[in-house]
Amino acid sequence: MLLERLSTHLAVVFAMLTSLTANADGGTLESQLRSAAENGQAAQVRSLLDQGAKLEARDKMGRTPLLLATHNNQVEAARVLIDAGADVNAKDSIEDSPYLYAGARGHNDILKLTLAHGADLSSTNRYGGTALIPAAERGHVETVRLLIAAGVAVDHVNKLHWTALLEAIILGDGGQRHVDIVRELIKAEADVNLADGDGITPLQHARQRGYKEIQVLLERAGARA
């Protein structure tokens, strides 16, 4: 009986020491994985996965290791995670996913990886927008091209009643990047007369802001005021 109790006691002590050692070494395998992913330590990410770290282990904000890697545009770490089967559509508490975030931020290398591994083109962010809409707003020309080529709906309307075309005009600066984006959207057959929630058309918005080049593009495409 005494030996049994001693054995049980030693087992408990061993478990506590193991836990303390893990914390001293940087926490659980999962917390180490998230940190390695966020900091672009691709070899460490691979090692932790080999040790059994859970691929989709989330932090308090619901962010997976892949989303954390995407936040910092850590391409190689993201590649290791995606090759291991990480979910490119897993959303956090504010409805960002690796695919949506890469598109919104113009992280094109990671975006290409997500597109090649099952990105849900119809998924939307907390504003009800596809990846194309914030990409258009922020002037990410190549990202817009990638998303159009992938098949994202160009006339999707978000919760603000804006399309990618409207957002490129309303929140853009009228400079060359946004001119190029408007051109790409028109080439993709975006509806140039699809108005916002107040009935204001893309052409009217362009005129109000004095965006001459965008006005010309819209008018040539058949836009009405």
Mark where each language-model region is.
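Intrinsically disordered, low-complexity regulatory segments in ankyrin-centric signaling systems
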Residues: L2, L6, L10, A22-Q51, ...
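Ankyrin repeat A-helix N-terminal signature
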Residues: S35-G40, L68-Q74, Y101-H107, P134-H140, ...
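Ankyrin repeat structural motif
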Residues: Q41-L49, Q74-I82, H107-L115, H140-I148, ...
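N-terminal, post-signal-peptide region of Sec/Tat-exported proteins
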Residues: S47-A77
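Leucine-rich solenoid repeat scaffolds
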Residues: N193-A225
